[in-house]
Amino acid sequence: MRYAVWLASLIMLGAYATSACSASVEPVQTVSISLGHSVVALNGPWRFKTGDDLRWASPDIDDSQWETVDLTPAPGAHDADVGLPGYVPGWSMRGHSGYIGYAWYRTRVTVDGDKDARLALAGPTDVDTTYQLYADGKLLGGPGVFSGKTPTVYSVQPTVFPLPVAPVNGTHTYLIALRVWMDPSDAGDENGGIHIAPSIGDADGIDLLNQVQWLQTFKGYVVDAMEPLAFVLLAIIAAALMVRRSSDSYRWLVAALLLTAWLRANQVLFFWTHVESLHAYDVITAVLLVPLALATWTLAWRDWFGVDKRPWLRHVLVALTIIYMLLSLIGRPWFASEATRGLKDVANALVDYVRLIDAALYLWTIGRGLIGRFRLSACLAAFAAVLVGVGLFAAELSKLGVQGIWFPYGTGVSRTQFAYAGFIAVLFALLLMRFAAYARVRLCR
């Protein structure tokens, strides 16, 4: 049987005094849905309240004094990462700027479906930062672990939640509640809470929707999954050049390629699985891998061009890397949360300055490599170094107003993905040229 999967916005019920984000004293009426074999996005109306109380999951709680919010997206709206449709700004744009912590969303839905039909919910696919989903007061699940003082956050992924109670005579009223936690690391002008509403429908339709959402998520990160394999292959080729016992050194190039492969693969690991928590991902990426990658790539190009091999550059980069790691850890919003905001702001500002010094040393190394070497191989190497730099210094390019992502065919492709794809091709050609040059030298002996 073919099922039509469609996402239709619900009719907004109730009056608003000023806007959808303002407080309302009007009780939210129950929304009625005739499902059949279909899927409906639960765009609203929702009751919303900051704070946390597990009793708010109960259908018996009076939420008439809560705020009323609408999650209906603008036509064509999608998230800024992989292109998932249905995006709306978070609570920071809805009267709660600067708020970090817990909040609840509640809505009542009367479903008029087929008798004994299996119903399910598709969880929200974009939430700052994690959530638990309840139906009629019963916890259905969610991507976060809420057992500690603050939740352990994992990536929000497309998820199906079977509804526990089948409609009696085809009709049932559900109280859907979402307990949301926003992590300090997600603070931002548009952030906070649900960005893409959950959907309700018959189980088969929800399964199809889930497959579509996973396909979109897969397409958004498939390049990040493939590029690390290419980086590892390039590292193996560079290591083979070392085995030839040439006078050139490639150990820093091998290290830089492997670190970059890890950096890219770690993003896929976080967004496709629940192996790594948000804080673990933050430490591995921002505190460890990024500083190490900046240093090793500068040393890799120094050795490639054969310029100024005195130890001063290595000593400076080691010091900068250690400083970068310490400052980056201090500046993490979740680390040592009792520390003053001013201390963290200073640490993050100093990280920006360290990155600028790293960028200056990186560009200096490329410039020194080109002086007096305007042959094809040197120009290609400089081009490859610039392409890597586009990924390494993505934050600085974004601050300069350089566009960071495009959505060809509705799927997000980042500036870094484009740059690394070009770099892989150029470096592969350069390594083959080096192999050919070494072979010619051996033949001439």
Report the location of each language-model feature.
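Solvent-exposed beta-strand/loop surfaces of large extracellular or lumenal domains
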Residues: 77-86, 139-160
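Extended carbohydrate-recognition surfaces in non-catalytic/accessory domains of CAZymes
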Residues: 23-116
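N-terminal signal peptide c-region/cleavage motif recognized by signal peptidases
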Residues: 17-19
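An acidic-aromatic loop/edge-strand motif
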Residues: 52, 153-225
